[in-house]
Structure formats: structure tokens, C-alpha cells
Design a protein with these regions (language model features):
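Short, well-ordered alpha-helix to beta-strand connector turns
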Residues: 23, 59-60, 119
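General beta-strand structural signal in soluble alpha/beta enzymes
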Residues: 49, 120-125, 169-172
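Rossmann-fold NAD(P)-binding glycine/threonine-rich loop
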Residues: 90-137
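Rossmann-like NAD(P)-binding element
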Residues: 44-46, 52-96
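Active-site-lining helix/loop region of Rossmann-like oxidoreductase modules
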Residues: 143-208
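NAD(P)+-binding Rossmann beta1-loop-alpha1 motif at the extreme N-terminus of oxidoreductases
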Residues: 1-45
Length: 208
């Protein structure tokens, strides 16, 4: 699959490395072209780095691996995203990571859909720490990625990506369910960083 990763932070780098390693065609876009190029070179597997618009132009799926506050500028830089799958992996959290800045009546994925009304926005990967994106870091455990979106075809593409790097993609319903998934992501941050569990934790829905 042709995937653009927008952002060179821990989540962007982790997803880019995992997806490129799984055989996907990965392009990395960032405002800092040198960082994008350096990350692509480090990852290898044919990954390329450049500006945001160039990365998006050659991709079918675009991963917005950015803080929620940076989304508007990134989408403006992306150019035409009509018909493309936009994966929102963000949690709209405060600077101290301790609370959501929006939620329940609106949510990050909905605001991104407003910014890109012709794109197919899907919420996913927001409950996974960057340290668990590399398949070997999970030590054989299969973690779940909750996938919410309004287009079944878009969700299927995201599930395929998740499966290709060793996750279990779980259909979490329409995009509006992101308002429930985002608090799960925030709770995971609390478990990891404020309750002493560390970043090797992730929520899993178990049917009994």
C-alpha cells in the first residue's frame, strides 16, 4: 500500500519503520525536509522523505502523526486530499498530558474531518504507545487497534495496515465513536506515565 506518514516524531517514525519493514511504499512528509529525509534514510526499505504535499501526492493512505494542535497547518500543507484515507492517531491532550482539551461533544477526528471534508477520516492507533509499534517490541502479543470511521472501505484499508504490522484491527464503529476512543487513549497515557505501568501497556477489548 502507498502510505504517507506526516510527522517525524516517535509515533511517525515508529509507524514509518514498521510499515516500510512490512513492504509498504512509505513516503515521509514534514515541514523540516532534512528531518524527513534523514528518517527515510535511517528506515530504508525504499522509504522516501520530503515535504508534506509531495508525500501526500503519491499516497493512498495518509497517517497524520502529529499533535492535534498541528493538524490544521499540516492539512493546509497537504494539498488535495480528496478521496484519500486520513488516519488520525492523535489524542487531543493538554501540554502536561493529564487531560483532554476537547471531547464528548466534539473530538479530534471530527475536527479533522471538518478541515478535510472530501477525505475519508479514520481514527486509529491512538491507544498504542510508540514503543510498541515495532513488531518485535510486543514479544508475540497481539494488541488491538480500535478503528472508527464512516467509510467501510477506508476502515478496511486501515485494518489491513494494522494487520500487516502484527496488530488486530478492531472495527469500533462510525467516526463519531472517536469521542469514546480518545478518552481511552488518555487513560492509557495515565496508566503508562502517571500510574507507574510504563509505556509497554495497551487496552484490549476481551469478549468473555
Amino acid at each position: 500500500m502507498k502510505v504517507a506518514i506526516i510527522g517525524t516524531g516517535n509515533m511517525g517514525a515508529g509507524l514509518a519503520a514498521a510499515l516500510a519493514g512490512a513492504g509498504h511504499n512509505v513516503s515521509i512528509g514534514a515541514r523540516d525536509l532534512a528531518k524527513a529525509a534523514a528518517l527515510a534514510e535511517r528506515i530504508g526499505h525504499g522509504a522516501i522523505g520530503g515535504d508534506i504535499a509531495a508525500a501526500v501526492r503519491v499516497a493512498d493512505v495518509v497517517v497524520l502523526a502529529l499533535p492535534f494542535g498541528a493538524m490544521e497547518a499540516a492539512i493546509e500543507s497537504a494539498g488535495d486530499v480528496s478521496g484519500k484515507v486520513l488516519i488520525d492517531i492523535s489524542n487531543p491532550i493538554s501540554a502536561d498530558y493529564k487531560e483532554l482539551v476537547i471531547g464528548h461533544t466534539t473530538f479530534a477526528a471530527e475536527e479533522i474531518q471538518k478541515l478535510a471534508p472530501k477525505a475519508l477520516v479514520v481514527k486509529a492507533f491512538n491507544t498504542i504507545f510508540a514503543s510498541l509499534l515495532a513488531p518485535e517490541a510486543r514479544e508475540g502479543k497481539v494488541l488491538q487497534v480500535f478503528i472508527a470511521g464512516n467509510a467501510d472501505t477506508a476502515k478496511a484499508s486501515v485494518a489491513e495496515l494494522a494487520t500487516s504490522i502484527g496488530f488486530d484491527g478492531v472495527d469500533a464503529g462510525p467516526l463519531s465513536n472517536s469521542r469514546f476512543i480518545e478518552p481511552i487513549g488518555e487513560m492509557n497515557i495515565h496508566f503508562g506515565y502517571f500510574l507507574g505501568k510504563g509505556p509497554a501497556v495497551a487496552p484490549v477489548w476481551v469478549q468473555v
